[in-house]
UniProtKB/Swiss-Prot annotation:
Pfam families, A to Z: Maf
Gene this chain is encoded by: maf
Entry keyword annotation includes Cytoplasm: yes
Location in the cell: Cytoplasm
Main location: cytoplasm
Protein name: dTTP/UTP pyrophosphatase
Length: 207
């Protein structure tokens, strides 16, 4: 049985941890792109950015492999919130989100090399942040969790103290809708879940 390599085009420790928890073998590959898209519809926006990340990462891979990328945003009243640039922006984002519903979108993209077969999909989850005093927002920012997070919060950390409820896929809010991803990998690319491991057709997935 031969081997197939999987590359994750993401620097997110949350996405890495989610895949590691599944015993899914992968390597990290850089995908430095400007995270901007001309798409206005949130679902198309995240799928476009996820595909751009996967495409950029694929440029440096010269072997048979599968490349996975993802992009997550928060949308409230039609406005897209990305990652805060500074404390003031983080405070503004959390102030906007508190006491109301917003939607988390994550786009996923998969490219099979060398033939460049690709597929994209997305997941959305509704999230309600409880009402927060300014002191609560400042305390949360002081935890340091808001950086590098769409919408300036992390649901799996201290952010669990400010989230009132969710409707939909929890892991999507963390940053990677794993059920949606593995459905795509199986349906479009032949990656199978076998016991406590995974296979690609007649090949073993390996680092």
């Amino acid at each position: 049985m031969g081997c197939m390599k999987i590359f994750l085009a993401s620097k997110s420790p949350r996405r890495r941890e989610l895949l590691e928890n599944l015993n899914f073998p992968f390597q990290i590959v850089e995908n430095d792109i400007e995270e901007v898209s001309s798409e206005k519809e949130p679902s198309k926006y995240v799928m476009d950015l996820a595909f751009k990340k996967a495409l950029k990462a694929a440029e440096n891979i010269k072997e048979e492999a599968i490349v996975i990328a993802a992009d997550t945003i928060v949308v409230v009243d039609g406005e897209i919130l990305g990652k805060p640039k500074d404390r003031e922006e983080a405070f503004s984002m959390l102030k906007t989100l508190q006491g109301r519903e917003h939607i988390v979108y994550t786009g996923i993209a998969v490219i099979k090399l060398p033939e460049m077969k690709h597929s994209v999909d997305y997941q959305e989850t509704k999230v309600w942040i409880r009402r927060l005093e300014d002191e609560d927002i400042s305390n949360y920012i002081d935890t340091g969790e808001c950086w590098d997070k769409a919408g300036a919060y992390a649901i799996q950390g201290f952010g669990s103290l400010i989230v009132e409820k969710i409707e939909g896929d929890y892991f999507n809010v963390v940053g990677l809708p794993v059920a949606k991803l593995f459905d795509l990998l199986k349906r479009e690319f032949g990656v199978k879940w076998v016991g406590r491991g995974f296979e690609y057709k007649d090949k073993r997935l390996a680092l």
